[in-house]
Amino acid sequence: MVKVEDDVEGSGINASVGDLRDAAVNPQPALLRATVKEEEGQPSSSSSHVRSQFIGMGFSPMLVDRVLQKHGDRDSDTILEALLSQSALQKSGSESGSLGDLFDSDNEENSSHFAPRKEVIQDIKVEADSSSEKRSYLLSTMNFSQREVDLALNQLGEEASLEQLVDFIVTGQVSGCSGGNENGDASNEVKDESLFGVMDKTLHLLQMGFTEEEVSSVIDKAGPEATVLELADTIFARRIASSIEQKEVKVEPDFLDETETSYSAYHPSNSGLRYYDDDHDNIRIKRAKHMFIDDSAGSSSRAGNQPNLDPWLKDHRATTSDGSVKEEFDAMTPGIRRNVRSDVANPPYFLYGNVVEIPKATWRQLSEFLYNVEPEFVNSQFFSALSRKEGYIHNLPTEGRRNLVPRSPMTIEEAFPFTRQCWPSWDTRKQLNSVATEVAGIEQLCERLGKMVRDSGGYLSQEKKTHIMHQCKLANLIWVGPDRLSPLDPQQVERILGYPRKHTNLFGLNPQDRIEAMRYSFQTDTLGYLLSVLKDLYPDGLRVLSIYSGIGGAAIALHRLGIPLQCVVSVDQSDTNRKILRRWWSNTEQKGQLRQINTIWKLKINVLEDLVKEFGGFDIIIGGNFSSCKGGTTVNSSMGMDSNQFFEYVRVVQRVKHIMGRLQVRAHESARHRHRSPSN
């Protein structure tokens, strides 16, 4: 009999009046909002978004403030018309060939010469077909420099549209030139070198998913000499600080097993990063690194005299400074981790998996929050037809691993045999790159590429072949005819990721939503390889606590391994994800119990203790990439990684390990007492 309990409405785990009161007193970090105090002469907090939007379009902050004071912030069309009108009037006053004068936002008169980005792009009347025509248009009509045009074409490719090229150049100019032309023409060469370095870094940061406003602000603050990694870390730090900096850590005494005196020298105001917990009896503030139970036994040698240095910024000095964003993994095949302490290696096991490519420096910081266990990197191409770099932090044994049987297809041809008849020999792809979710313009792209093949008359130049392959890799297009390309449909994505057929096929869920639900999902063959060691350790079944379960990748991997699931407590805020997992649980006739919880914020200390008591503990705590399956509104939704949610996963791991460790000690003492009693 399958017993499924859904805690979305409070069943399974009772929600008390006290819990509701706690939620009101201690709002969730995701719900925190900064209070903006209105000052005379400045736009109100309600207009800050509108102000940022128009400044991001390239208008002078002073001009935007003046227009907002005159017209208010409710009618965007009126504001835009006023800005364009005043910009046009000011622009006709004088012309300046200096980039410094052109973009000096502190000088209202000079800043008015800058045509807003939207206006510049709208002025493009033609779509040049060849790179030479685009180059000529950018140089003669748009008056960009030769070096700006060369850099844009090199970075975006000759097939990029004029709009994309103009947007790239203008973004670099806005980010890199905030000062005046104070040094005269003698410094132009130096400024040009700095400009193109800034433009290159700007492109990298935009490709990483950061907003233009974030990129422009961080470059202006950190300076053009900062590396891409340093700039990215700074943006991450700002995002983290804005979402959780004002939350206090509430830690009960037995959590840390430390005395009161160990806190006496600590000042809350010095804490750069704070955490949230739920004990109201003993409230203390402590640095984030001390949230771990046995911190003194850790192998990290990091000094503790840097309370104001955000953990996401540490160690960036040791990284390369060449501006490179993509860092290759040392070993892309699974390897043995070297520094799992004996006490950490004991159950309950934990596994945190991240399928989003992030810098090594960030991985180092993540591992420090999980007992300094080194991450294990793997490429899913060794287990499937998906080539994706993944990382896992876990304390699982590594001996006795095995592949899932039957294995998922290892190549595109194995996954989709129908492509054999139409796959061109010059398309050498064997595997797909990622779960592409972008659908805007995909049909037009397929039609354009197909027309390129048809018009070639059977002969494609190497340049066109390279271009077609590049577009196919970006959008994960496959050949469905001699001159026809198509994106993957949801069932094909399910097959690549190792999920059952029609796993995400819910009533009312369109194909795009189905693919979006799989965007950050585990590849079950890859995950199953790491989890396979549990089969011999737990022949009678596993008790699983699954954090950010997504569409159930961890449970499916264990099921494919043939490991019985005694219970799965699944935490995921997406109603779609919960329905998908619940239907799979029922369809596979699982004998255990599924308990679904709709938010990690419900896993308070007393709730975790009740769950451990109810199920007798957990054998493994699995965490993955957070995804709301609604487009996301979290601070790092574009990357699929929410730092705040990761810290909550760490909190749960630490709490569960401590609760179970405490119960084991009590059980041992009780057994010893019973053993001695008969002899007394």
Swiss-Prot record:
Any one Gene Ontology BP term: methylation
Boundaries of every SAM-dependent MTase DRM-type domain copy: 336-663
GO cellular component: nucleus
Keywords, in A-Z order: DNA-binding, Methyltransferase, Nucleus, Repeat, S-adenosyl-L-methionine, Transferase
GO terms for MF: DNA binding; methyltransferase activity
Matching InterPro entries: SAM-dependent_MTases_sf, SAM_MeTfrase_DRM
Region of interest: Disordered: 1-24, 91-113
Subcellular location: Nucleus
Chain ranges of the UBA domain: 45-86, 194-235
Family: Belongs to the class I-like SAM-binding methyltransferase superfamily. DRM-methyltransferase family.
Function in brief: Involved in de novo DNA methylation. Involved in RNA-directed DNA methylation (RdDM).
Protein name according to UniProt: Probable inactive DNA (cytosine-5)-methyltransferase DRM3
Source organism: Oryza sativa subsp. japonica (Rice)
Gene for this chain: DRM3
